Amino acid sequence: MSDIPSGALEADESRAVSLLSRVILPRPGEPLDVRKLYIEESTTNSRRAHAPTRTSLEIGPESEVSFATYFNAFPASYWRRWSTLDTVVLRVELTGTARVDVYRSKATGARITVGGAPVAGEGDGPAAVEFEIDLTPFEDGGWIWFDITTNTAVRVHSAGWYAPVPAPGRANVAVGIPTFNRPADCVNALAALTSDPLVDEVISAVIVSDQGTSKAKDHPGFADAAARLGDRLSIHNQPNLGGSGGYSRVMYEALKNTDCEQILFMDDDIRIEPDSILRALAMNRFAKSPILVGGQMLNLQEPSHLHVMGEVVDRANFMWTAAPNAEYDHDFAKFKLSDAEEPRTKLLHRRVDVDFNGWWMCMIPRQIAEELGQPLPLFIKWDDAEYGLRAGEHGYGTVTLPGAAIWHMAWSDKDDAIDWQAYFHLRNRLVVAALHWDGPVSGLIASHLKATIKHLLCLEYSTVAIQNKAMEDFLAGPENLFSILESAMPDVRKLRSQYPDAVVLPGATSLPPASDMRRKKIAIPVSKPAIAVNLARGVVHQLRSHDPETHVRPQINVATQDARWFSLCRVDGVTVTTADGRGVVYRQRDRAKMFALLRASLRQQARLARKFDRMRKVYRDALPMLTSTQKWESVLLTETPEKVGR
């Protein structure tokens, strides 16, 4: 196709054959920052555009609306890389008089004009205009979008991105939702699946693994949500086996008791944009070869913020991180997609390749699930990353698809790096590293040693204690994972409760007022000399005995964001606010405990260094057992499933 801007396709026969993604509009009453995920309106417009439905838009006369937005621009480079398509078709149906202009971006973020045409729809019905855009120029990055400039009042009846050929395979999705004591969230997720008729059509089964004591079926809204799903919904009660146990049950039931072609993993505590399911499904069906298709994560509390475009595992220290050319926490309300001058926005136009996708939303083809087997028995953390790495070793890629997304609570509102979950972070990181990493373990151990020192300087003794247990349990071998799948979490919480930094108090007023009223906030040390000086002073302080009075009355009260090692390394008693702001913990320095924990950690790290190569072989030999259906049946099939009918 020519690079010269051109007009619309001839109106004879539509080239829009198979829907890839609809243009979707904000819900009624959405705030401005959320609206910017869907449309960008010119400041010269006389009034805001109004969306009567999720797929139609009313625009005033003499107005300009751009669809260069997160949900409505087309991520062309991902379709160029992963799909069989050579072109994509934009179809817009509207009444009124307007002009539709189509643009694309390069991997640098620079805007290129593709073409445009006037459109006039009157009387009998809307006029349709189509543009077919070549995907060849999108090897390294780029999006496609369109703008509408109106002369008269215009109603966009529908718009969407289409393939010019029929979709291969079948649309037959089994949706799986593990839940634990979140009945309201689970019911909302179930209701969302039937809120959109096109989404409802492609869902053949909904599998809920309910692992809590507060059951979803007992929620007042459950009956209505279940009635809409009919006999497609099944509830499976089981002990609390964590996310990995919940998703393993989903995969087990989907493969054994449905004829689904796609298995969609979804968290219970999310808000989903329903069209995301159709977008992931379209990528699944048009893929050159079977792939895992993941949705991205938006921040539930700051809805215009994208968590990250994609993630990889850093092979230097075997820790997940943002993929190359990706950054965390992009605010689309502040930095719009078409802002080519903003460095953060430019990165959004580069295609990001990933190692895995979070299981907040991830579509797995049946073929891959049958070949790879079940998730690992990890309870929580790293199970999704491991499955992506395992898939990659079998030749199956993972795509984190822009524009397919859910809203989920941000990690910044959680203390999971220091609370009981820190055990699973480390133990499972070691397990997955043993299975899928051939690099020197020195990088991983060095990063953990650095983290241990920081935890001790921050008086996070409970974190170090459970991480020592994590190393011990990893070295106990793979056979141990199933035997402690249900018991590890309560055991870890019990161990952690022995330390004051694990006890959450209602607030700082639960204790006497802080004694040091003159202490100033310490500036963040940036230069190496400043870091060295602060560290040396902190270490010297750690060698001294603590003042017993500081374990009765804290010296200072510190906010979460200020609880850094250089702020806490020279105090003996301090309250620190929890990440969610709902309480405080009273951290207390204890030289004897600190040295005992440090010695235990160094011993375990030395054991890791000596034994890690042998553990690689042990875990890899055990992988067929860890992922086998038969082994999982022994822990999953403990209660009778409930089939929910109309």
UniProtKB/Swiss-Prot annotation:
Keywords assigned: Cell membrane, Cell wall biogenesis/degradation, Glycosyltransferase, Magnesium, Manganese, Membrane, Metal-binding, Transferase
GO cellular component term of the entry, any: plasma membrane
Cofactor(s) named in the record: Mn(2+); Mg(2+)
Active site annotation, chain numbering: 384
Gene Ontology BP annotations: capsule polysaccharide biosynthetic process; cell wall macromolecule biosynthetic process; cell wall organization
Pathway(s) the chain acts in: Cell wall biogenesis; cell wall polysaccharide biosynthesis
Reactions performed catalytically: beta-D-galactofuranosyl-(1->5)-beta-D-galactofuranosyl-(1->4)-alpha-L-rhamnosyl-(1->3)-N-acetyl-alpha-D-glucosaminyl-diphospho-trans,octa-cis-decaprenol + 28 UDP-alpha-D-galactofuranose = [beta-D-galactofuranosyl-(1->5)-beta-D-galactofuranosyl-(1->6)]14-beta-D-galactofuranosyl-(1->5)-beta-D-galactofuranosyl-(1->4)-alpha-L-rhamnopyranosyl-(1->3)-N-acetyl-alpha-D-glucosaminyl-diphospho-trans,octa-cis-decaprenol + 28 UDP + 28 H(+)
MF-aspect GO terms: glycosyltransferase activity; metal ion binding; transferase activity
Known EC number: 2.4.1.288
This protein's record includes keyword Repressor: no
Sites where the protein binds Mn(2+): 267, 269, 408
Gene3D superfamilies in the cross-refs: 3.90.550.60
One Pfam family matching this protein: GlfT2_domain3
Family: Belongs to the glycosyltransferase 2 family.
Assembly mode: Homotetramer.
Cited function: Involved in the galactan polymerization of the arabinogalactan (AG) region of the mycolylarabinogalactan-peptidoglycan (mAGP) complex, an essential component of the mycobacteria cell wall. Thus, successively transfers approximately 28 galactofuranosyl (Galf) residues from UDP-galactofuranose (UDP-Galf) onto the galactofuranosyl-galactofuranosyl-rhamnosyl-GlcNAc-diphospho-decaprenol (Galf-Galf-Rha-GlcNAc-PP-C50) acceptor produced by GlfT1, with alternating 1->5 and 1->6 links, forming a galactan domain with approximately 30 galactofuranosyl residues.
Protein name: Galactofuranosyltransferase GlfT2
Organism: Mycolicibacterium smegmatis (strain ATCC 700084 / mc(2)155) (Mycobacterium smegmatis)
